[in-house]
From Swiss-Prot:
It is an enzyme of class 2 (transferase). 1-deoxy-D-xylulose 5-phosphate binds at residues 156, 182-183, 204-205. Its main location: cytoplasm. Its EC number is 2.8.1.10. Catalyzes the rearrangement of 1-deoxy-D-xylulose 5-phosphate (DXP) to produce the thiazole phosphate moiety of thiamine. Sulfur is provided by the thiocarboxylate moiety of the carrier protein ThiS. In vitro, sulfur can be provided by H(2)S. GO terms for cellular component: cytoplasm. The active site is at 95 (schiff-base intermediate with dxp). One of its GO terms (molecular function) is thiazole synthase activity. The gene is thiG. The lineage of its organism: Bacteria, Pseudomonadati, Pseudomonadota, Gammaproteobacteria, Vibrionales. The keyword Cytoplasm applies. InterPro entries: Aldolase_TIM, Thiazole_synthase_ThiG, ThiG. PANTHER family: THIAZOLE SYNTHASE (PTHR34266:SF2). This is Thiazole synthase. It comes from Vibrio vulnificus (strain YJ016).
Length: 257
């Protein structure tokens, strides 16, 4: 069971709502994923209409909403969007995203830390999307973020865990849940993140852009479960030489004696 702030989750797979061909496909894919937390960009949601084609299926399925501040270019924009989301959606949960460069969508560490500190003071449960920077993640933890969401690779790149070495440090040091976000392009990437000890992963493009998003959502569900089980079971350590699984030494000695 994963606990973040005041909520508990059976599923360690969080999902996004963008890039799906239509809202029905989105709803079916999220259902098959087993996800209990879905993020959505405020700019894509009619926050004054609870029957919005993104909100309605999520709410009816009991999926927790995680509005994000995608599109915010600085802390001021993100804080404004956060308060708007809380008033309209009735949730103080927030995925904090600040990326001023529209081409690469790299998160701004300075503005993210400043916004996170203020939003925590304002009573938000803040989950910041950030670089896989161990020092930054520790600072975000220290200002009160409920979890950290370091990137595996650039958003939508499907490159996997390019930042693996830094993710491992973050996971080893963190005292709050670590959710690997961005760049996860295949179920194997998600499984590996879980094997490293990540508490959860967030996947959007790899599911939404698949030839069969519903089947791919199911594949990610199974991969996350397998990766977590492997981590909890204790993976065998790596060695630089061969180790026979069925040594014949004693058997041969007996035969030759």
């Amino acid at each position: 069971m994963l606990k973040i702030a005041d909520k508990q989750f059976h599923s360690r797979l969080f999902t996004g709502t963008g890039k799906f061909a239509n809202s029905q496909l989105m709803s079916q894919a999220i259902e098959q994923s087993g996800s209990q937390l879905a993020t959505m960009a405020l700019k894509r949601v009619d926050i004054h209409n609870q029957q919005d084609d993104i909100l309605s299926p999520l709410l009816s399925a009991g999926v927790n909403l995680l509005p994000n501040t995608s599109g915010a270019k600085n802390a001021k924009d993100a804080i404004f969007a956060a308060h708007l989301a809380r008033e309209a959606l009735g949730t103080n949960w927030l995925k904090l995203e600040i990326h001023p460069d529209p081409k690469y969508l790299m998160p701004d560490p300075i503005e993210t830390l400043a916004a996170a500190e203020q939003l925590v003071k304002d009573g938000f449960v803040v989950l910041p999307y950030c670089h896989a920077d161990p020092v930054l993640c520790k600072r975000l933890e220290e200002v009160g973020c409920a979890a950290v969401m370091p990137l595996g690779a650039p958003i939508g790149s499907n490159k996997g865990l390019v930042s693996q070495d830094f993710l491992q440090i973050i996971i080893d040091q963190a005292k709050v849940p670590v959710v690997v976000d961005a760049g996860i392009g295949a179920p194997s990437h998600a499984a590996y993140a879980m094997e490293l000890g990540a508490d959860a992963v967030l996947v959007n493009t790899a599911i939404a852009a698949a030839r069969d998003p519903i089947a791919m959502a199911r594949a990610f569900k199974l991969a996350v479960e397998a990766g977590r089980l492997a981590y909890e079971s204790g993976l065998a350590g790596k060695v630089s030489h061969a180790v026979a699984s069925s040594p014949l030494t004693s058997f041969l000695d007996e035969c030759l004696s």
